[in-house]
Structure formats: C-alpha cells, structure tokens
C-alpha cells in the first residue's frame, strides 16, 4: 500500500514487484503465502503511514501457506510444512507471495481446513483466546456470565465459541440484525440482546439481575456508563480497541477491573 489520497486514486493500492525476502536466519521461516485475511489492523497501519512522504508498506497480518526455507535455529518447522499465523506489526505483512516470520509465533495449519479458512483464524482467534484465558483467567471450572458486545464480529464470534467450548460461563451476546442474532445463537450464545437498544442495560440485567461477571468489548468509546451499570462488583472487563481518551473512574466504586488485550504485544515484547 502507498499512503495518500482516497482509494479511487490508482496508486493508493499498488500491485508491485519487490525484492524477495532474504534467506531466513535464526528462528525465521520463509513462507509461500497461499491465502490471507483482511483485518481492521490493516486500516490502522495504513492510516499511520507518512502520507506526505509517500511511505509504502506491505500490509497483512493473517496468512496460511507453506514453508519453503528455514533459519539455522528453527526446530518447529521444515520445508514443506503447511502453517498459519498472524505475524508481527514490525515486519512486512502477508500481502505478498513470500513472507519471513518467526517460527515461534506460527502454528501448523489444521489439516481439516483449506488455506483460506485457516488464514481467517489467527488474529481473531488469538485475540479471543488471550482475552479470555490470559486476561480474564477463565478455565474449565469457571462459571458466571460474560457479556459479549459486538458478538457477531470476528473476535466476538470466537469469544462465544471458546467460552462455550472450554468453560461453564454463560454467554449474553449483543447483536442487532436478524442475521446477526441467528449467527450468534448458532455459535452457542445463551441469550441475545439488541446491541443498539436504548434499554440495553435493562435487557442485560433482566437476564443477569446481579450483573455480569465479565465483559468482552471491541469498542470502549461511550460504553463506560453501560458497563458500570451491568457489571457486578469486582467484575472484569477486557477491551481490544485503541481508545486513548477513556475515563474509567466510574468503575472504581465497584472495584471493576479493566484489561487491555493486544495480540501483537506478545511478538513485540516477548
């Protein structure tokens, strides 16, 4: 991608030929990309480019493909292995035929999935997994209720499925359109409430009168009053957005915990 202008300008998104990545060293593997996925992070990275300077960047942080070369320290994969991964923000992305990626943030592609299906999973699934099990510390014996806002989205859909498959926590999902409501119910949501309803808090509390134990939210802006109302004392919230001006003081009276989930923190900071 090249920064600058609206998408109707021909050179904003460029089909370009660039030098092939260098031979992999260390823990890097070189992957022939067979399929990729598009995510909000692509838009965010592109928006941060130097528009005036015409900065260029290979986007893409979800891929599936085949290993064609490995570094001297690799132990997990060898040429010919099919893999899938999200990659790291600091490196060129998957919108190319070849990509270098650290094997330690790569997984074997499930044999039951084709490349396109596998490429749709890493970023959303890892985000949902870390939100539930690293941030909220849910486990097999966990109970209570989680409110999943934006439940029909990519991450929300995975949050529902992982919660129902791996815990005893009940799921209240928000959705608006009939298709979205049917979708989240098909994934296992125990109850569905109207995402845009003015009485959303009342709908949630009608299902969980004492408040929900946990909340997953993909968007924080304007949500703190709702969350203050529907989360029980000592409850927990995990958010995945980039809201910079967020006043959380209203949560203090109930000692509600707020967690940030950022999937790229692990490859960036170890």
Question: Which stretches of residues belong to each language-model region?
Answer:
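Residue-level recognition of short, solvent-exposed, well-ordered loop/turn junctions
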Residues: 24, 78, 139-141, 232
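Short amphipathic alpha-helix with an adjacent loop that forms part of the alpha/beta core around
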Residues: 199-210
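Glycine-rich phosphate-binding loop and adjacent beta-alpha segment
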Residues: 222-270
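Glycine-rich beta-strand-centered segment in the early N-terminal region that forms part
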Residues: 19-37, 47-90
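N-terminal Rossmann-like NAD(P) cofactor-binding module of classical short-chain dehydrogenase/reductase
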Residues: 84, 213-216
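A structural motif shared across PLP-dependent enzymes of the aminotransferase-like
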Residues: 90-103
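Mid-domain Rossmann-like dinucleotide-binding core that forms the NAD(H)/NADP(H) cofactor-binding site
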Residues: 119-197
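Short, glycine/polar-rich helix-capping loops at beta-to-alpha or helix-loop-helix junctions
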Residues: 94-95, 175-183, 245-248
């Amino acid at each position: 991608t090249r920064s600058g202008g609206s998408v109707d300008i021909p050179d904003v998104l460029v089909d370009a030929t660039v030098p092939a990545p260098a031979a992999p060293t260390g823990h890097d593997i070189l992957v022939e990309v067979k399929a990729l996925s598009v995510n909000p992070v692509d838009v965010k990275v592109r928006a941060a480019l130097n528009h005036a300077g015409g900065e260029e960047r290979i986007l893409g942080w979800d891929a599936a493909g085949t290993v064609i070369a490995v570094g001297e320290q690799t132990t997990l994969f060898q040429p010919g292995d099919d893999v899938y991964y999200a990659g790291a923000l600091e490196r060129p992305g998957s919108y190319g035929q070849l990509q270098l990626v650290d094997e330690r943030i790569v997984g074997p592609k499930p044999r039951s999935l084709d490349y396109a299906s596998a490429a749709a999973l890493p970023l959303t699934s890892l985000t949902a997994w870390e939100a539930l099990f690293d941030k909220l510390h849910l486990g097999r014996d966990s109970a209570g209720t989680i409110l999943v806002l934006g439940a029909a989205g990519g991450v929300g859909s995975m949050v529902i499925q992982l919660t129902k498959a791996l815990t005893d926590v009940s799921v209240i999902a928000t959705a608006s359109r009939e298709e979205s409501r049917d979708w989240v119910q098909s994934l296992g949501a125990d109850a569905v409430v109207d995402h845009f309803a003015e009485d959303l808090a009342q709908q949630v509390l009608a299902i969980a009168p004492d408040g929900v134990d946990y909340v997953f939210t993909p968007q924080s802006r304007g949500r703190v009053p709702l969350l203050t109302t529907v989360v029980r004392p000592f409850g927990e919230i995990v958010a995945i957005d980039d809201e910079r001006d967020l006043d959380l003081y209203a949560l203090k009276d109930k000692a509600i915990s707020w967690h940030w989930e950022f999937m790229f923190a692990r490859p960036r900071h170890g």
